[in-house]
Amino acid sequence: AEETSFVFSKFKPLEPNLILQGDALVTVAGVLQLTNVDKNGVPEPSSLGRATYSAPINIWDSATGLVASFATSFRFTIYAPNIATIADGLAFFLAPVASAPDSGGGFLGLFDSAVSGSTYQTVAVEFDTYENTVFTDPPYTHIGFDVNSISSIKTVKWSLANGEAAKVLITYNSAVKLLVASLVYPSSKTSFILADIVDLSSVLPEWVRVGFSAATGASGGKIETHDVFSWSFASKLAGXXTKDSSFLDGG
């Protein structure tokens, strides 16, 4: 498929178009809950969950040299009972079709080593709430681009609004290899943006899965919720000379 698009305005408890891994589930209220909470809604430690779209996405084509541009938007909240002890974060990712949950905690279910490795074939936009110094994390909550490594190639400070719904738009323009992520809190009108050049065709396989991964801390009460309320995605294979990036505004 040269073009793919889908919209989840909310999620269904038995959603056929979602692959749930680890602790991820859809609540009766239609919320994609990536990590565990107890019966009182309190997040639990050492939890890891992922959710991906059921169909693989064609991100580039070796026969034609075409590379996809894409736009995805989603709404999520992170809520920590104690803002002083939070971990670890949520990520939107593109990874090989056979990708399975990896190490939890600071690895966010996407990697298993602090060392970069081309075999991961993974690109992620992380919303990271914990400073893992071994991953060269900055000393604050941040948005980061992860390319074959949990150590981000670029980060920007992100002021987490505890329990507030954030709206995220991530776009990739294949003509100029530009990856852009923005996060807005509509209630407080604060926004954060990160952009960098990433050549997806040199990192990812031709077909990928797209979705979310999240994890809580293993010890010390470093816990938070990771809830996704809605998600849309559109991609289109395009040549380098294309002018059609109209869908990149995310609708």
Curated annotation (Swiss-Prot):
Keywords from the UniProt entry: Antimicrobial, Calcium, Fungicide, Lectin, Manganese, Metal-binding
Binding, Mn(2+): 126, 128, 137, 142
Top-level taxon: Eukaryota
Binding site for D-glucose: 88, 106, 217-218
InterPro entries assigned: ConA-like_dom_sf (IPR013320), L-lectin (IPR016363), Lectin_LegA_CS (IPR000985), Lectin_legB_Mn/Ca_BS (IPR019825), Legume_lectin_dom (IPR001220), Leguminous_Lectin (IPR050258)
Membrane-spanning intervals of the chain: none
SUPFAM superfamilies for this protein: Concanavalin A-like lectins/glucanases
UniProt keyword Cytoplasm, yes or no: no
GO cellular component entries: protein-containing complex
Keyword Transferase assigned: no
CDD domains listed in its UniProt record: lectin_legume_LecRK_Arcelin_ConA
Pfam families in the cross-refs: Lectin_legB
GO biological process: defense response to fungus; killing of cells of another organism
Binding residue positions for Ca(2+): 128, 130, 132, 137
Function (record text): Galactose-binding lectin. Exhibits hemagglutination activity in a calcium- and magnesium-dependent manner. Also binds to several carbohydrates including lactose, D-galactose and GalNAc in a calcium- and magnesium-dependent manner. Likely to have antifungal activity as it is able to inhibit the activity of the A.flavus alpha-amylase.
Family per record: Belongs to the leguminous lectin family.
Subunit structure: Heterotetramer consisting of heterodimers of alpha and beta chains.
Protein name listed in UniProt: Seed lectin alpha chain
